[in-house]
């Protein structure tokens, strides 16, 4: 007797502790409630496996399937789902309090591109030397970034001072 399956639905003799099953044949037709061993014999007659589809229902629902092909298709679906899943990255844009107009526009285009790709953006404003005394200029700059991106992004972390840097994190809507 083979060891019970660790993953996926139970099949054939791995289905234990069941007297009757709700049977669905290979064409998808409901055969009603059938004794388990009769269902197993019918599956062997047609050369397919008896696979437990809904183990929690009473009686459990079983279907005639080619178990190898069924597991292959399930694995394929999981791999496709994994491929489609995108990990959210945090991209960083570094600004200075005295940034020029054109430089600011270039940085904002980059921010917009990051949001289109679905990434979060960490806006870092770095103060050098005596610039730290003029934090209000930095705060106004970050507020301007927030205003210009409010259509496409939401603020995940409000502007806050960490050492000589002011940081704000934005996430796409």
Curated annotation (Swiss-Prot):
Keywords: Cytoplasm, Initiation factor, Protein biosynthesis
Domain of life of the organism encoding this protein: Bacteria
This protein's record includes keyword Zinc: no
GO BP terms: ribosome disassembly
GO molecular function: ribosome binding; translation initiation factor activity
Major localization class: cytoplasm
GO cellular component: cytosol; membrane
Keyword Membrane belongs to the record: no
Subunit structure: Monomer.
Function: IF-3 binds to the 30S ribosomal subunit and shifts the equilibrium between 70S ribosomes and their 50S and 30S subunits in favor of the free subunits, thus enhancing the availability of 30S subunits on which protein synthesis initiation begins.
Family label: Belongs to the IF-3 family.
PANTHER family from the UniProt entry: TRANSLATION INITIATION FACTOR IF-3 (PTHR10938), TRANSLATION INITIATION FACTOR IF-3, MITOCHONDRIAL (PTHR10938:SF0)
Listed name of the protein: Translation initiation factor IF-3
């Amino acid at each position: 007797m083979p060891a019970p399956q660790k993953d996926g639905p139970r099949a054939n003799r791995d289905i234990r502790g069941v007297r009757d099953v709700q049977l669905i044949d290979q064409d998808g037709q409901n055969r009603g409630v059938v004794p388990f061993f009769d269902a197993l014999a019918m599956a062997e007659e047609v050369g397919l496996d008896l696979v437990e589809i809904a183990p929690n229902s009473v009686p459990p629902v079983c279907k005639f399937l080619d178990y190898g092909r069924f597991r292959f298709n399930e694995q394929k679906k999981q791999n496709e789902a994994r491929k489609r899943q995108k990990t959210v990255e945090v991209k960083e844009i570094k600004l200075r309090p005295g940034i020029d107009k054109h430089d600011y526009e270039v940085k904002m285009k980059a921010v917009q591109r990051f949001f289109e790709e679905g990434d979060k953006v960490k806006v870092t404003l770095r103060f050098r030397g005596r610039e730290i005394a003029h934090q209000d200029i930095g705060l106004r700059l970050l507020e301007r970034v927030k205003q210009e991106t409010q259509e496409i992004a939401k603020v995940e972390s409000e502007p806050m001072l960490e050492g000589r840097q002011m940081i704000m994190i934005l996430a796409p809507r």
